[in-house]
Amino acid sequence: MTRYYIRPIALADSPQAEEGRAVRLAGGLVYASRFALIAREGGKVVSRDLFDVATLEARLPDLPVEVHEHWANLQRVHTPLRLGERTVRLDQPQVLGILNVTPDSFSDGGEFMDRPEVALAHAAAMAEAGAAIIDIGGESTRPGAPGVWEGDEIARVVPVVERLAAMGVAISVDTRRAAVMEAARAAGAHLFNDVSALRHDPRSLELAARTGLPVVLMHAPGEGEDLHANAAYGDVVLDVFDWLAKRRDAALAAGIARDRIVLDPGIGFGKSLADNLALMNALPLFHALGQPLLVGASRKRLIGALANEAPADQRLGGSLALALKAMESGVQLLRVH
């Protein structure tokens, strides 16, 4: 079976580019005037043809229906996320500020755990600086991190969620466990950010559908406790694209509304430096999935690998560069420290 993909490759900041007409990607601030139409059979790319907008549109009647869907998805305008009393627009980049209340996160483990006033002050500072959402996590998902009992995770997360909800902050909870999702929602959380894409806990899909809260589905090759395991790709970009398409479809089949699904290619999760860079360079392709995109590359290992093994707290320059790369690719949500 032949699979097709449309990758925008000539980006501009207006409908008119030097190369001619450009189309608006995902209703945002980025336009594209050239597109690669990629054909794949048996896991291998068999053709890659370059088109301008007019030529590609003229070819559409002769191409399979999935190409029509991808073309429409690339231009799909996303409705804002409704997060409690807050509305987060998706026609411009938005920031998720990371708040880890863990003892062992790779970047800031222990800094905010058991220090509620310090955690709240940091969250307030991020919101004041412009973060649209505060993303609270009670479990480290770095390589080799031990699993956390859901009761401990709830004890870490819920008090902070309650306090931030009282402040009127839009809150995301970063968890793989349905019990934590339930407790966080009851405490005032507005969004579930699941690094397992609702695979880890058999109750998660049903819970997300029942609550109606938006969800972030992230790619990770592993299952169970080790999300970084089983990393084997034929073409990392297209493999991740196909995987996210399946998780999107599983969420839709479970009853999660389409305008409640955000997709994340999972930078740094079970991927080599080359894999991560390939994904960063191909981010515009993922708009063809028809969902808002989230990218979290802040302070991650790939930055250290490119910056003379700089430790996590000295990766600001690389974090900014990758955030800007995501922004110029039309990514709507940037998860940052």
Predicted regions and their residues:
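N-terminal accessory interaction module
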Residues: M1-G84
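Active-site-adjacent loop and "lid" segments of alpha/beta metabolic enzymes
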Residues: M1-Y31, L90, F106-H122, T141-A170, ...
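Glycine-rich adenosyl-nucleotide cofactor-binding module
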Residues: Q75-M113, E117-E128
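Conserved, mostly hydrophobic/aromatic
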Residues: L99, M126, G130, D174, ...
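Catalytic domains of carbohydrate-active enzymes, especially glycoside hydrolases
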Residues: A121-G137, S329-G330
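Phosphate/pyrophosphate-binding loops at sites that engage ATP/ADP/AMP, CoA/4′-phosphopantetheine
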Residues: E128, A245-R260
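Glycine-rich beta-strand-to-loop/alpha-helix junction loops that act as flexible
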Residues: I136-E139, P143, D264-I267
